Structure formats: structure tokens, C-alpha cells
């Protein structure tokens, strides 16, 4: 999980800042609170998605068609909301690194320690290799969606 986060953290932070989002530690805490609530709402409502729907979205080349398909088939599902939690944790890690550029030591950073709670939560929701693959794919799709959307 930490490997996935380190691979995407800077991309997540840049996408958030491009959309005008605050990536400070306090904003990340509030975002995690919101994303966690949205995750449990999706889970309680059983808004699941299939690996097939994810694979279909991966094949869409046209950006407008992709956004429409994402909003229709994947947005606000359990997998989408879990990807959001991971993206916020990754953004927080990248922001912590950027704020402490020269002397950044993740193992000693309180922001990284706090964000690791979100990572632990995500790991607790994963039941096996299929869930890991779904999450990996959803994070990639969600990042594409975030980079294309205009909010």
C-alpha cells in the first residue's frame, strides 16, 4: 500500500492544487472525514461496482466519453470512495514532503504518521488480491477523472 501511495502522491497533490483544493494538513484531515463518510454511505447503500465496469472504463480513450461513463457507472460507488480515501492520504503525504523538502524524513513526520491511519483503514477494507487490483485500477481511473474535471 505504501508503495502505491509513494508512486501516486505527487500526482494526487498536483491534481488537487490544479483544481484549487487546499492540500494543507488541516484540509486533508477534513477531506478524510468527508471521504470516510461518503465511503460508509456507499457501503451502507451497497453501491458496488464490478471489475468489468472498471475494465470497460479503462478502455475509453475519449475524455468526454470517459467522464460521462465514470459519472454514470463508477462515481460514488464503494470502490470510488475507497479510492478517494487513498488519494487524500497520498496527497497528504506529498504535501508533508513538499513542506519539509530538504529535511523530510517520512518515518519522523507527524503528518505521515497521521495519514498512515487512513492507509491502515484502507488495508482493513481489502479482502484479497482482487480487492487490491480493483483499488489500483480505481485510483488510476479516479485520478484521470480528477485531472479532467472542472471543479
Explain the meaning of each model-derived region.
Residues 1-151:
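Flexible "arm" and connector segments at domain edges
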